[in-house]
Amino acid sequence: MPQTLSASDMVTPGSLSPPPTEPTDGEQAGQPLLDGAPSSASLETLIQHLVPTADYYPEKAYIFTFLLSSRLFIEPRELLARVCHLCIEQQQLDKPVLDKARVRKFGPKLLQLLAEWTETFPRDFQEESTIGHLKDVVGRIAPCDEAYRKRMHQLLQALHQKLAALRQGPEGLVGADKPISYRTKPPASIHRELLGVCSDPYTLAQQLTHVELERLRHIGPEEFVQAFVNKDPLASTKPCFSDKTSNLEAYVKWFNRLCYLVATEICMPAKKKQRAQVIEFFIDVARECFNIGNFNSLMAIISGMNMSPVSRLKKTWAKVRTAKFFILEHQMDPTGNFCNYRTALRGAAHRSLTAHSSREKIVIPFFSLLIKDIYFLNEGCANRLPNGHVNFEKFLELAKQVGEFITWKQVECPFEQDASITHYLYTAPIFSEDGLYLASYESESPENQTEKERWKALRSSILGKT
């Protein structure tokens, strides 16, 4: 089974309507993919597809796909400036006298586009200059209907609230990236362990789901593109995604922390009966995560139990009823590109689409596999074709994968938060890898010369003993 992951581990080197205008510069757009959307076109043509008119509005799928992928070729603030300029130019909004009938048909479409953009990609509007573009273009149509100005005020208010929530972020992982070294096992009477905080597997699975959804909520769709797709070589602008993946990185750290927390909780008890009890508890938690649709926590728990310091505890595992664990391992088996997991994920996705309750809507994918799928999609297809056109067909597939994730992450968690449990999950000390090995050797003595030598080295370096 996979071990814990870092962002570098995840990535190794190696229905739409046409706008009313024709392709520019005499170009011929590629063959349509869906209802008039070109499979490839110049960036200018794709931008034109985004711009509404009095008689045309781009379909929602096109808006999301282009706004997601366009940042590979043009920075969002520049794209917004271009869109606003085209709106002003095409609708003649710079004239002293406006065609009010025409503007009244165009205005709602412009506001709808801006609403969709700010709702889905709020981080594109963090700079004051982008807000200035919004106010300028809406200010030009406001004389035709004061409702436009009111709608703009509501839009900006919602945007500011969204940005404020994103800046606040989820609860931090205190010390998550700095595991402690093993010193000595504290007496059971004073050691605070997870089972002392929560002894019910279903409750812990619910709280893990609460944590997962809270952290997922802060990941913007643009982070997938910014983190895992190379900068377009034909673009003249500087890379626009160097430091814009903090929420994605934090989510990877959370997965790693949960792996190490599981291993730490198993290795900590002094008696094998207690260790076996903890293992069986986590097996039940993992099963409940599977039933809920929380595959990310499920994989983290399985990965933690499969870490070498845990898996070597043969005397402990001999006391564990492992039938349920083997079933879960089979579900998450990487064989066949995780075919068993992918089948289960499709089942959970179907359940979510037909859900009658909020609990049935939950789908939390195994995140690192989602990232790898997106990465290999990018690696397998060029961003541009030999003629310089943008490979829009590729980005439709990218948007399909990211869009599904966005739908899942927007589900409201139906479980009430238990602050004491989530605080423990975030802050409980975890062993480093060396600490886990030492705790494991202290629990069950080394069985071969290699283990004996490692145990001796760890006792010397960590405990100062020979």
From Swiss-Prot:
Where is the region Disordered?
1-37
Record's GO cellular component, any one?
Answer: plasma membrane
Which InterPro entries does the UniProt entry name for this protein? Ras-like_GEF (IPR008937), Ras-like_Gua-exchang_fac_N (IPR000651), Ras_G-nucl-exch_fac_CS (IPR019804), Ras_GEF_dom_sf (IPR023578), RASGEF_cat_dom (IPR001895), RASGEF_cat_dom_sf (IPR036964)
Keywords (A to Z) from UniProt: Guanine-nucleotide releasing factor
Domain annotation Ras-GEF: ranges: 200-446
Q: Does the keyword Cell membrane apply?
A: no
Q: Which pairs of Cys residues are joined through disulfide bonds in the record?
A: none
| GO MF annotation terms | guanyl-nucleotide exchange factor activity
Name all N-terminal Ras-GEF domain ranges.
34-164
Q: Does the keyword Membrane apply?
A: no
* Role, per record: Guanine nucleotide exchange factor (GEF).
Q: Which PANTHER family match?
A: GUANINE NUCLEOTIDE EXCHANGE FACTOR, RAS-GEF DOMAIN-CONTAINING FAMILY MEMBER 1C
Q: What is this protein called?
A: Ras-GEF domain-containing family member 1C
Question: Gene symbol?
Answer: RASGEF1C
